[in-house]
Amino acid sequence: MLLCIFLPLSAAANGETQAAGEEIFTLSFVGDLTLGTDPHISGGPNSFPSMIGTDYGYPLQNVAEYFLEDDLTLGNFEGVLRSGGYITKENGFSFKGDPAYTAILTQGGVDVVSLANNHSRDYGQRGLENTYSLLEEAGVPGILQNEYRVVETESGLKVGVLALLFQAKPKTVAAAVEAMRREGAELIVALIHWGVERSYHPSRTQEQLGKALIDAGVHIVCGSHPHVLQKIEQYGDGVIYYSLANFCFGGNRYPSDMDTAIIQQQVIRRADGTVSLGERTIIPACVSSQTPMNDFQPTPYPEGSESYNRVLTKLEGGFSGNPKQQSYPW
């Protein structure tokens, strides 16, 4: 029997040996997908709409190979897709994109997204409902706060995906896990919006809640909201990605921290039908293919570069630098 194998974060390895009767699946996780921008800058020459135009393959073209070849890709969809509408927030940024931007996800290989975040209602309840419907029509489930979806990959793995905010209650999550299992879910994933913006280290509340979610039956907890990377922590039979930062982020043309990552997690299904987590591959990346201006095209860093190693340090929980003092390879 092959037990759970967790490699050091510095190892981006493949080729795990399979025991007889085992199947191995690969799930990819990314951070914030903000396919649009604030209306105050939407008409600028370097804004997301201006850069993308109708080339919907452009934003994810440097990373699509990872997503199109895996079994399932998941992320946090932060913003609204709709034509027109009125901003309902009095302060802060409001993110909106063209309804046609669902093609960015489908062409780029993104399969499931969470809509549980602080920008899903930037244009009110109607904006959220419109976004949900557009994603459904495109075949990309958008999961609402405290709701779940059991999705089956083309390769036959049934994954229960739960969308949460920081107020999540472990008892409620445990009940949702049981419901997903009754619907056939073999693996349970929680996509949760939590933490402190621009903090490289999870709060005590995050750590306590993340572990409670694993105790409640979740295999993988994937966090968003801080906009920067935070550590990965193995806990029991599960794993917590505290924050995967921005990924394809149309909300900021000049982000102070451009580091991001793709996490590819292997899942092992044994002959008796039980599943466990296998090898984990880290793909350190930048939110842009150039600097200092964000061109909204996430791009892997050259292996072994200063930026590549900095991402690994952040995911190991050892980073304490200033985002404005970081260097990039382009």
Question: Language-model segments: which ranges?
Answer:
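Sec-dependent N-terminal signal peptides of Gram-positive bacterial secreted proteins and lipoproteins
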Residues: 1-14
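Acidic, metal/ion-coordinating pockets
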Residues: 14-330
